[in-house]
């Protein structure tokens, strides 16, 4: 914290006015950068005129993965520190005017869907955890395969997750 306040030219009291500790600032930065990724993906989605929740979700996932594939330092920063708790905190805190209201936009996409899904927050959690945990090694190390080879499997898995969350779905029969 001493290095941060010295480089920023502010007093420690000022730092602690805005952040609880160094982990709080890290989490806010991760949340902000992740929000930027989702915001850019949402802008691209609107420009694409893709309809249907499933197709929109796949588009957003691909858009974000494409960006992370070209910016491995951003991937390293976000993925190593990404947790549901960071997202959850970002959803619950009062966002700045500049922050993208990702969770609300996600709920809006769900509301426009012809399909009703149970537990929207749990659905989002499951997809974020799947994508972030499995794509990291594919992008940075091409392990166990490169991202291009992995994507079809990722998308089919997302489709299975969506099927499992359909309201009234008999998961035993899926």
Regions found by a protein language model. Give the residues of each.
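Helix-turn-helix
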Residues: 1-24, 28
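Hydrophobic alpha-helical connector segments
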Residues: 28, 42-70, 124-127
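Hydrophobic/aromatic-rich alpha-helical bundle segments in the mid-to-C-terminal region
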Residues: 110-157, 165-174
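Alpha-helical DNA-contacting segments of helix-turn-helix folds
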Residues: 19, 26-40, 78, 98
